[in-house]
Amino acid sequence: MVAHRATRRKRASATQLYKTCKLSGTCPEDVINKVEQKTWADRILQWGSLFTYFGGLGIGTGSGSGGRAGYVPLGSRPSTIVDVTPARPPIVVESVGPTDPSIVTLVEESSVINSGAGVPNFTGSGGFEVTSSSTTTPAVLDITPTSSTVHVSSTTITNPLYIDPPVIEAPQTGEVSGNILISTPTSGIHSYEEIPMQTFAIHGTGNEPISSTPIPGFRRLAAPRLYSRAFQQVRVTDPAFLDNPTTLISADNPVFEGADTTLTFSPSGVAPDPDFMDIVALHRPAFTTRRTGVRFSRLGKKATMQTRRGTQIGARVHYYYDISPIAQADEIEMQPLLSTDNSFDGLYDIYANIDDEAPISFRQSGATPSAQLPIKPSTLSFASNTANVTAPLGNVWETPFYSGPDIVLPTGPSTWPFVPQSPSDVTHDVYIQGATFALWPVYFFKRRRRKRIPYFFADGDVAA
């Protein structure tokens, strides 16, 4: 049997404890601070509210109406409501005193009304004289205004976006002069001849890329800039100018920036080299070629004078070091690499005449045994139709052509299974195992009109 747990009694809240213990003075400090809003969080909010004011923005824990203007969707502008107050006539309010009558009459007394001018008195018994008149002229009013000066102005604005091409006026005849006239082709009959313009190269070779970004080249100082009158020419003979020029200007600095950058110096005492006196800047190096050789150049700036304002005035110096001279090219007599005689070179030509060839032997030095390949002469067969072969390989070497031996291509057996004969009834010089073969040289330079190539060649003649 499961025992029932006792019901947990709810603890009194801080507000309930404050009501019972405040009178007796036994309330804990945290209960008093929480109820009276004296905690650190409440104090921070109270101090911050002294400097900020969010009234009228609808920020709070109310009904969520969004303030007086309501919520505005994102990406839209709030609608503007204009309050129009109806016009009312002004009402004059008269104060009523204690001595004034309580009943106000609607009609004023006649004695108070001002009648204005007096009534005229007529004398005599004749009465009034009645006069009648008649006229036939119509009553026409002259409504013509007085003469005035009228100025009429007109302005014409041409907008190329709203001009129809057929409406464009054809240009006049161009002037025959050295100028280039570029016009827009229009409709209609022209008084001149339209010649299409072609692109031509004025500067350069004409092979410069025009449709893509070219590879940026290296910026080099032109020779006339280095050897002009604006620069003082100084020749340097110390090799330290190539890799460590700071030793020629100031004391040796172990933390060297590099020889391929612009070096700056502060004008100090005496320089180790008198040619580098008062140098404040030494620009990056440049290699140039002269008639005498290859030259290593640097531009330097001196600060010989300095004004009170701090402006440095000095000459610009061109320091150069000749690396290597360029000697005149010696004329070397050219020797032929190969001779024209048909000497034995250790290779076997399958198209050579076998009767004129000698046995091929391969010899090696040392203990390696030698091997000899004997070649047996055989009768050569020629076709009835022969043709001369001419291969334009050049005039340097003479290329001899000979008729080759009999070549037997592989053929499939007529019966199956195929039993090879032993020994073979026909003895040939060369056997080809496979479908690869060497083409006759005359077909190397023949223009191909079709993709068909003869399957094989025998004895230098085409097998039809």
From Swiss-Prot:
UniProt modification remark: Highly phosphorylated.
Location, primary (coarse class): virion
Coiled coil region boundaries: none
One Gene Ontology term from the biological process aspect of the record: microtubule-dependent intracellular transport of viral material towards nucleus
GO molecular function terms noted in the UniProt entry: DNA binding; structural molecule activity
Cystine residue pairs: C21-C27
Key words of the record: Capsid protein, Cytoplasmic inwards viral transport, Disulfide bond, DNA-binding, Host endosome, Host Golgi apparatus, Host nucleus, Host-virus interaction, Late protein, Microtubular inwards viral transport, Phosphoprotein, Viral penetration into host nucleus, Virion, Virus entry into host cell
Subcellular location per the Swiss-Prot or TrEMBL entry: Virion; Host nucleus; Host early endosome; Host Golgi apparatus
Position of the signal peptide: none
Domain of life per record: Viruses
Short sequence motif named Nuclear localization signal, residue ranges: 1-12, 445-453
One GO location term (cellular component): host cell Golgi apparatus
Protein family membership: Belongs to the papillomaviridae L2 protein family.
Subunit structure, as described in the record: Interacts with major capsid protein L1. Interacts with E2; this interaction inhibits E2 transcriptional activity but not the DNA replication function E2. Interacts with host GADD45GIP1. Interacts with host HSPA8; this interaction is required for L2 nuclear translocation. Interacts with host importins KPNB2 and KPNB3. Forms a complex with importin alpha2-beta1 heterodimers via interaction with the importin alpha2 adapter. Interacts with host DYNLT1; this interaction is essential for virus intracellular transport during entry.
Role this protein plays: Minor protein of the capsid that localizes along the inner surface of the virion, within the central cavities beneath the L1 pentamers. Plays a role in capsid stabilization through interaction with the major capsid protein L1. Once the virion enters the host cell, L2 escorts the genomic DNA into the nucleus by promoting escape from the endosomal compartments and traffic through the host Golgi network.
Protein's name in the database: Minor capsid protein L2
Species this protein is from: Human papillomavirus 66
